[in-house]
Regions:
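Active-site catalytic loop in hydrolytic enzyme cores
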Residues: 67, 95-173, 182-191, 195, ...
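Short polar catalytic/cofactor-binding loops
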Residues: 11-16
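A short C-terminal boundary segment appended to hydrolase-like catalytic domains
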Residues: 253-275
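Short beta-strand scaffold segments in enzyme catalytic cores
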Residues: 89-90, 103-106, 137, 222-224, ...
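Short beta->alpha transition motifs characteristic of CBS
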Residues: 49, 56, 105, 117-123, ...
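Cys-nucleophile CN-hydrolase/nitrilase-fold catalytic domain and related Cys-dependent amidase chemistry
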Residues: 19, 28-110, 182-202
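Extreme N-terminal starter segment of soluble prokaryotic enzymes
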Residues: 2-9
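CN hydrolase (nitrilase-like) catalytic-core segments centered on the catalytic cysteine
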Residues: 68-87, 159-242
Length: 275
């Protein structure tokens, strides 16, 4: 059975607060990934508005609310035009007026918004402008002759083992981690992604922003880790980049047979984890 899927990573360099130019640029890069044969394309955290919340301040909410429908429409068109699944992280308008979540939107190959994940562990200033999420949904990806189940965690979520484990227990084979990860914590980026992949025996795809937003340096180094935690592909730290890499999902079954972490769990003695 063919279980190979081509993953597109868009290591994006944007302009803080300039939603229109960021959308135009993102569509170009999505097209580049599709031209390289990507089945699923992932953008980094808050690609459309930018991330430096100390500079955006109250504009974080006004930009997100004012441009949400525009972002959704453009990303839906990008997915449909390029016939790819697309993970587009953005502030998501909730049913409450003026309230956003820091989210990742999932579009299918027809441009339909099929689901979203709301970041649950908010970092620093994020909690002033975003509402936290409270669920870890999984999503079924259906290609012509292949299918898989994916999950999403966003940036700081990756530091909490429970995030990725929740997705693995629901059958995820790939977990995407769009991020705006700062240069001071590059070591944690490397450790967290590989460890989440290994302990759950699945693929982790980390897609980080690149560039400077004021005093915030975002270093890229987007990567794909296999179910043993090994880095299969890593993008540079010194520039924007688009890359497509093929993974074989049969590796998930193979490694879960060889190293049965999930099978050998003992939930009945983990009660302290729920406190």
């Amino acid at each position: 059975m063919d279980k190979k899927i081509r993953i597109g990573m868009v290591q994006f360099e944007g302009n803080l607060g300039d939603v229109h130019s960021n959308i135009v640029h993102a569509r170009e890069l999505i097209g580049s990934a599709a031209a390289q044969g990507a089945d699923i394309v992932c953008l980094p955290e808050l690609f459309a508005t930018g991330y430096n919340l100390s500079l955006l301040a109250e504009k974080t909410v006004s930009l997100g609310c004012a441009h949400y429908e525009y972002i959704v429409a453009e990303m839906a068109a990008a997915a449909k035009d390029n016939r790819v699944y697309l993970i587009a992280p953005a502030g998501r308008k909730t049913e409450m007026e003026g309230i956003l979540t820091n989210s990742a939107l999932l579009f299918d190959q027809n441009g339909a918004l099929t689901g979203y994940f709301d970041k649950s562990h908010l970092w620093a200033l994020e909690r002033l402008y975003y509402k936290e999420g409270n669920a870890y949904p999984v999503f079924d990806i259906r290609l012509q002759d292949r299918s898989t189940r994916i999950g999403i965690m966003i940036c700081y979520d990756a530091g909490f083992p429970e995030s990725c484990r929740s997705l693995a227990l629901q059958g995820a084979e790939i977990v995407f981690c769009p991020a705006a990860w700062r240069i001071q914590d590059v070591d944690m980026w490397d450790l967290n992604l590989s460890q989440r992949a290994l302990e759950n025996l699945l693929f982790v795809v980390g897609v980080n922003r690149f560039g400077h937003e004021g005093d915030l340096e975002l270093f890229g180094k987007s990567k794909i880790c296999n179910p043993r935690g090994r880095v299969l592909r890593e993008l540079p730290m010194d520039r924007e980049s688009v890359d497509v890499f093929e993974i074989d999902l049969m590796d998930v079954e193979r490694f879960r047979t060889e190293i049965p972490y999930l099978r050998d769990r003992k939930p009945h003695i983990y009660g302290e984890l729920l406190k």
